[in-house]
């Protein structure tokens, strides 16, 4: 499951994994493990959007090795069997699996992020604009991916602006079960 920051990937992925009885692994979780290996102390969903998290993301831009290692670890987990993975680039890096893109405007994602992180919607829009731009540049540089623009790898695209995360999860679950039958 992929999509722009704060579109609901993690929440939806947890619901999908629980319903399908499979483990869930997040690219952010693996990246946080690597941040710990680098001496950081990540914590909370909003860690990326504040002090140390943003500093780590800046350091990460100096070398593609961080992201390539995260992606290698996720691809390894994917090859082990049924698993729900949240990741920005993995859908472009493998032909295997059912690939889902969650779509949402900056406005709806900012509202979601504001509720989650307890910061103002305007500040969230600014943070998301920076993250969106940086993710696009990063994955273009590392893999040649037009992140957020090229949706060809995806089997299912779900627009999340007008429906809640539970409904998004239901749509994904129904699609996955239909593909399994």
Q: Where do the model's predicted regions map?
A:
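P-loop (Walker A) phosphate-binding loop of NTP-binding proteins
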Residues: 4
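ATP-binding Walker
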Residues: 7
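Walker A/P-loop
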Residues: 10, 28
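ATP-dependent small-molecule kinase phosphotransfer cores
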Residues: 29-93, 107, 119
